[in-house]
Amino acid sequence: MLFRSGNSSDGSQTMTFNGGYVFVSQTGGGNGPLDCGDSNNSITYSGGTVIAAGSSDMFETPSSYSFLSTTSVSAGQTITFTDASGNVLATFTLPNGSAEMVMCSQESSVTCYTGGTLSGTTYFASQDSTNRCGYGGTISGGTAVSASSGGNSGPGGGGNNRPF
């Protein structure tokens, strides 16, 4: 889990996600939550679950993704991503506000919600003992977040994209 101002995950080279869970919350203008640099580098996604939320100034998307949105989300709000059957893929309470977010998973049909009530979710341990990041279970209620078009749409798109 990365919570930073500036470039939260700054590879300045090719960045690859192969598995596991990655949660990134970034704040600060002129930067983005994922940054692979500008020299023909790319962000490649081939597995796991990745959520990156932050400033839209230098927002880059991985080679493929399941959900992209330019809906603003305030600090302290919870975003939850579900598969087509309503199962929670990942949930993240944002420590920083977000102007844009991307979510990568092996699912091709993903819905995002803010708020709602989670049940049966497993949370990752954190130093401050908050249930900030987790997976599994179900969600009831919540407000659906609109997906944005542009850039790559769904698994199999390009890389090092700044969609807007």
Outline where the language-model segments fall:
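A composition-driven surface/loop motif
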Residues: 1-164
